[in-house]
Every structure is written in C-alpha cells, then in structure tokens.
Amino acid sequence: MAKPIPRIGSRKNGRIGSRKSGRRIPKGVIHVQASFNNTIVTVTDVRGRVVSWSSAGTCGFRGTRRGTPFAAQTAAGNAIRTVMDQGMQRAEVMIKGPGLGRDAALRAIRRSGLLLSFVRDVTPMPHNGCRPPKKRRV
C-alpha cells in the first residue's frame, strides 16, 4: 500500500494568511453605487481591498423595493456596522449613479459617527461618446 502524501498547509497546520475580520482598519473608502433598481455599498481599505459590502437585495428587499431610499439606508447601515467593529474611524465617500438611494445612503453614513474627509461624486459622464439606447414606449 502506498504511503499517504503529507499535505503542506492543511487546516491541521494552522491558518495560512490573515483572516479578514482580524485586520484593524483606521481609515477606509465607502463606495455607494445607486442605480434605479438597487443600491450597493462597498467598504474598502485605502489600498482598495474589500472589507465589507452590502446591498438592498442582501438586506431582504426584493423587486421594486430595492431601489427605495429606505433600502439604501439599511444597506449602508449594514455595511458600516461591520467595519466600525474593526476600528474604522475616518472614511472617504465615493457616490456613483443616479438612483434614489444616493442621499439616503449618505445620510446613513453621516449618522454612523464616522469622520468623513470628503464626499465625491464619481458618476461616469460621457463626453458625447456612445449613442444612448432608444427611448422607452410604454
């Protein structure tokens, strides 16, 4: 019978690499993507590695309720709560998109107690690039 091959870096040898929740993050970047159908809030560290994220869909909102301001407020609160436990005190906010959840998400971020260094609108605007899709006829 053949000898078993010893595994290098198995779970028995202990954890390799750092766990996400173990990091202390004093400063981060909060990205809010607000479309008409959903609002996604992603919290990253300064280097751009994702620490936490939430969306209106993951908070339990379905259908047209995902695009509401209340759903965006709930999603922002969920994403920020986890990073506050990891020690985040200061943040920059980048808001993208035309959705209804823009202001509600920003209001929830302000209420959370984080010190905001700046709030920037990074919505992509064409310099007359591609032709837009035809208008809807309902």
From Swiss-Prot:
Cystines in this chain: none
Pfam family, one: Ribosomal_S11
Biological processes, Gene Ontology terms: translation
Superkingdom of this protein's organism: Eukaryota
GO MF annotation list: rRNA binding; structural constituent of ribosome
Gene3D superfamilies: Ribosomal protein S11
Annotated region (Disordered), positions in chain: 1-23
PROSITE patterns: RIBOSOMAL_S11
GO-annotated cellular components: chloroplast; ribonucleoprotein complex; ribosome
Subcellular location: Plastid, Chloroplast
Primary localisation category: plastid
The entry's keywords: Chloroplast, Plastid, Ribonucleoprotein, Ribosomal protein, RNA-binding, rRNA-binding
Basic residues bias: start-end ranges: 9-23
Recorded family membership: Belongs to the universal ribosomal protein uS11 family.
Family matches, as NCBIfam families: PRK05309.1, uS11_bact
Quaternary structure note: Part of the 30S ribosomal subunit.
HAMAP family with a match to the protein in the record: Ribosomal_uS11
Name of protein: Small ribosomal subunit protein uS11c
Species for this entry: Buxus microphylla
